[in-house]
From Swiss-Prot:
Cellular localisation: Cytoplasm
Protein name: Triosephosphate isomerase
Active site: H96, E168
One record GO biological process: gluconeogenesis
This protein's encoding gene: tpiA
Binding-site residues, substrate: N10, W11, K12, G174, S214, G235, G236
């Protein structure tokens, strides 16, 4: 079945509010119709108000880069999914390898966050991916499959069909190494197969799976040609308006 592509830029810990506003103003009027593709940027928490406000009359959607699994309470430094929804965010990225690695997030944390995000009417972009060691040991499919199953446990079939999964091999994030087209296709298909096993083929046919890891305007077309790759989660190439817009040339 045909799934609408989704290109999401992850700014990570970059841009101040003025830079975020300038970026949105530079890209907003040049984006293709939402009939063709969903386009989003994941802004740091300190930029979300400005980014959402700047994007509100355009087709650009806005993601938070993380949230907590409780709506309110004594959780110093955390971001409420309820408030993200009230602010007008569309998506929340969860389970990024940087969060898992540097901030010790577990599969259980990510699962709780996914449930909290849905409870507040937002859509999770759930990241998964393996280290170079796991990849070279030939255990990538098994490892990533376990991450996906754990992240989605207890969600409804309808919820899973509507979310976004982002496969990002850790060895390809910001390293300049990118997975081959075959790697990306095989792993994104493996992710979809896990969804099929856990929730049925109909759900697996609907869920969108992104590839992430050194995606650039020069290679995005190759990845987007893969039958099981429905989009890209893009880091470095999403920081400049021109390179971000160039990522959408795969539509032509």
């Amino acid at each position: 079945m045909s799934r609408k592509p989704i290109i999401a830029g992850n700014w990570k810990m970059n841009k101040n509010p003025q830079e975020a506003k300038a970026f949105v103003e530079a890209v907003a009027s040049k984006l293709p119709s939402t009939d063709l593709v969903d386009v989003a940027v994941a802004a740091p928490a300190v930029d979300l108000v400005t980014t959402i406000e700047s994007a509100k009359d355009s087709v650009l959607k806005v993601a938070a880069q993380n949230c907590y699994f409780e709506n309110t309470g004594a959780f110093t430094g955390e971001t409420s999914p309820k408030v993200l929804a009230e602010m007008g965010a569309d998506y929340v990225v969860i389970g990024h390898s940087e969060r898992r690695d540097y901030f010790h997030e577990t599969d259980e944390d990510i699962n709780k966050k996914a449930k909290a995000i849905f409870a507040n009417g937002l859509t999770p972009i759930v990241c998964c991916g393996e280290s170079l060691e796991t990849y070279e040991a030939g255990k990538a499919v098994e490892f990533v499959g376990a991450q996906v199953s754990a992240a989605l446990a207890g969600l409804s079939a309808e919820q899973v069909a509507s979310l976004v999964l982002a496969y990002e091999p850790i060895w390809a994030i910001g390293t300049g190494k990118s997975a081959t087209q075959d790697d990306a296709q095989n792993m994104c298909k493996a992710v979809r197969d896990v969804v099929a096993a856990d929730f049925g083929q109909e759900v697996a046919d609907k869920v969108r799976v992104q590839y992430g890891g050194s995606v650039k305007p020069e290679n995005v077309k190759d990845y987007m040609a893969c039958p099981d790759v429905d989009g890209a989660l893009v880091g470095g190439a999403s920081l400049e308006a021109d390179s971000f817009l160039a990522l959408l040339d795969f539509l032509n």
